[in-house]
Swiss-Prot record:
InterPro entries: AAA+_ATPase, AAA_lid_4, DNA_helicase_Holl-junc_RuvB, P-loop_NTPase, RuvB-like_N, RuvB_C, WH-like_DNA-bd_sf, WH_DNA-bd_sf
Annotated spans, Large ATPase domain (RuvB-L): 1-186
EC number annotated for this UniProt entry: 3.6.4.-
GO cellular component: cytoplasm; Holliday junction resolvase complex
Positions of Mg(2+) binding: 71
Name of the protein described by the UniProt record: Holliday junction branch migration complex subunit RuvB
Length: 345
């Protein structure tokens, strides 16, 4: 039976249950934002420079894996500029007219945030080029030989685009961003600070050791850390005295199948199939997906990125291979002659 990727507690994607809580935990200034020190410093310079000049900053592209705070930074950028924020997403802009309507309603210094900007439809993207560069759009009226193009001015604005796949952006769109910031995964110590702040806002009693325990299982992602904190809170309120200690956190995360490295049932199923059924590989992702009863896209896009980053799975030209760390994590010994990724694979 296949698993809905968004139902996993360790999914970095925004789920329905995250929505309202995610907003309440969102930092309101660069000073409050935890982690990403290099990005924060760069943004502070971009924002302050624009404020000193009394103009709008360059268009800003935020790239990086999901759950690291790109939307939060967009909200902060608008707040730091004292500007209104208009939010939309790439998939919502299917036609050029959708974008034209939004651009025509902007006022000077507004911030327009487009999430998943790599998924914007081509007609809307081509209209965006002109709006970003010249602050105008050409609206086509009529059809066929009688169609005419009417230029419309757009108030000077700042576009903040967010993407998890910067390589999927077309060159012309990427080149129109004056500043690009790449966000990296968080260190456990940074996630501990995120958890302490979130616990304070949510009124959760969180022990220091408990924060460290949750942080190291959060895959370097604040969104996952906050979600696990809420699950542990539920456990503490129902089965303990409401106080989250390290033992309570460990017991709660065991209930939700999140192990000490942040792997869940699906991750371990992939590793188990790779080691037990295929002797460590190499094996193709489609075959591996059949072995665990999942779609190949789920294994490749949901499980594999973290397993590769954690050093448990290696991608080679011949297929996926379990590393020594994967065998160790499962408490197994690699059989003699087990395949290991070569130096140049």
């Amino acid at each position: 039976m296949s698993t809905d990727p968004d139902e996993r507690e360790v999914s970095p994607a925004l789920t329905v249950g995250d929505g309202d809580v995610d907003v309440s935990l969102r930092p309101r200034s660069l000073r409050e934002f935890i982690g990403q020190p290099r990005v924060r410093e760069q943004l502070q310079l971009v924002i302050q420079g624009a404020k000193n000049r009394g103009g709008t900053p360059d268009h800003i592209l935020l790239s990086g894996p999901p759950g690291l705070g790109k939307t939060s930074l967009a909200v902060i950028i608008a707040a730091e500029l004292g500007s209104s924020l208009r939010m939309t997403s790439g998939p919502a802009l299917e036609r050029a007219g959708d974008l034209a309507a939004m651009l025509s309603n902007l006022v000077e210094h507004d911030v327009l945030f487009i999430d998943e900007i790599h998924r914007i439809a081509r007609p809307a993207e081509e209209m965006l080029y002109l709006a970003m560069e010249d602050f105008r759009v050409d609206v086509v009226v009529g059809k066929g030989p009688g169609a005419t193009s009417i230029p419309l001015d757009v108030a000077p604005f700042t576009l903040v685009g967010a993407t998890t796949r910067s390589g999927a952006l077309t060159g012309p769109l990427r080149d129109r961003f004056g500043f690009t910031a790449h966000m990296d995964f968080y260190e456990p110590a940074e996630l501990e600070r995120v958890l302490v702040r979130s616990a304070g806002i949510l009124g959760i009693q969180l022990g220091a050791d408990a924060g460290a325990e949750i942080a190291r299982r959060s895959r370097g992602t604040p969104r996952i850390a906050n979600r696990l904190l809420r699950r542990v809170r539920d456990f503490a309120e129902v089965r303990a005295d409401g106080v989250i200690t390290r033992d309570v956190a460990k017991a709660a995360l065991a209930v939700y199948d999140v192990d000490e490295l942040g792997l869940d049932r699906l991750d371990r199923a992939v590793l188990s199939a790779l080691t037990r059924s295929f002797s460590g590989g190499p094996v193709g992702v489609s075959t591996l997906a059949v072995a665990v009863g999942e779609e190949a896209s789920t294994v490749e896009e949901v499980c594999e990125p973290f397993l590769v980053r954690a050093g448990m799975v290696a991608r080679t030209p011949r297929g996926r291979v379990a590393t020594a760390l994967a065998w160790t994590h499962l408490g197994m010994t690699p059989p003699a002659g087990a395949n290991q990724p070569g130096l140049f694979e």
